[in-house]
Amino acid sequence: MASPVVSLLLVGICALAFVHVARSECCTSRELVEFKMDRGDCEAVRAIENYPNGCEVTICADGVAQLGAYCGQGSCNIFGCNCDGGCLSGDWSQEFVRRNQQYGIQIIKVTRLPF
C-alpha cells in the first residue's frame, strides 16, 4: 500500500495532465469619445448629447458603441476575462469615424479606459 503523500502526488500529476494551457485575455478596455457631427443627431450612432461639446459615446476597439459591460466578441466572465471568441479588435476611434462617415464626425477628445 502506497503512502498517502505518494497517492496525493500521483493524483495531482494526473490532474495536471488534463489541464489545458490557459490564456485569459481580459476585454475591459474601452474608449470614451467626445465628438461633433455635421449631419444627424447623437442617437444615430448610439451616443448621448454632451452639451456644449456635441456628443459622447463609449466604444470598443471595433468602433461600435459598447454593448454590455465588456468588449468581448461573446460572453465574458464576471471580471471581463475569458470572453468567448476573444476581445473585439480594430482601430478604436478611427474605426468609429470610418463606420459613421455619413454623419461627418469630428473627434474632439478620446479617453482610453481603464487608464
Swiss-Prot record:
**InterPro entries listed in its UniProt record:** Diedel (IPR025061)
What's written under domain? Answer: Contains two subdomains, SD1 and SD2. SD1 is composed of an antiparallel beta-sheet covered by an alpha-helix and displays a ferredoxin-like fold. SD2 displays a new protein fold made of loops connected by four disulfide bridges.
Subcellular localization is given as: Secreted
Q: What is this protein called?
A: Protein Diedel
Q: Which GO terms describe its biological process?
A: defense response to virus; immune system process; response to bacterium
Q: What induces it?
A: By viral infection with Drosophila C virus (DCV), feline herpesvirus (FHV), Sindbis virus (SINV) and vesicular stomatitis virus (VSV). Strongest induction occurs with SINV and VSV. Highest levels of induction occur 6-24 hours after infection with levels declining steadily until 96 hours after infection. Induction requires the dorsal-related immunity factor Dif but does not require the myeloid differentiation primary response protein MyD88. By muscle tissue stress.
Per the record, the major location class is secreted
Q: What else is known?
A: The name 'Diedel' is the German translation of Tweedle and is based on the fictional Lewis Carroll characters Tweedledum and Tweedledee due to the presence of two subdomains within the protein.
Gene3D superfamilies cross-referenced by the UniProt entry: 3.30.70.2800
Cite the entry's keywords alphabetically: Cytokine, Disulfide bond, Immunity, Secreted, Signal
Q: Name one GO molecular function term.
A: cytokine activity
In a knockout, what does one observe?
Mutants have a shortened lifespan and succumb more rapidly than controls to SINV infection. RNAi-mediated knockdown in fat body leads to accelerated aging of the intestine with intestinal stem cell hyperproliferation, epithelial dysplasia and accelerated induction of apoptosis in the aging midgut. RNAi-mediated knockdown in muscle had no impact on systemic intestinal tissue aging.
Cited Pfam families: Diedel
Cysteine disulfide partners in this protein: C26-C81, C27-C87, C42-C55, C60-C71, C76-C83
**Family as reported in the entry's similarity comment:** Belongs to the Diedel family.
- The signal peptide, as residue positions, is 1-24
Which tissues show it? Detected in hemolymph (at protein level). Also expressed in the fat body and is probably synthesized in the fat body and secreted into the hemolymph.
Q: What are the annotated GO cellular component locations?
A: extracellular space
**Which function does this protein serve?**
Cytokine which promotes survival following infection by Sindbis virus by suppressing the immune deficiency pathway. Following infection by the enteropathogenic bacteria E.carotovora limits intestinal stem cells proliferation. When secreted from muscle or adipose tissue, can attenuate age-related intestinal tissue degeneration by inhibiting apoptosis.
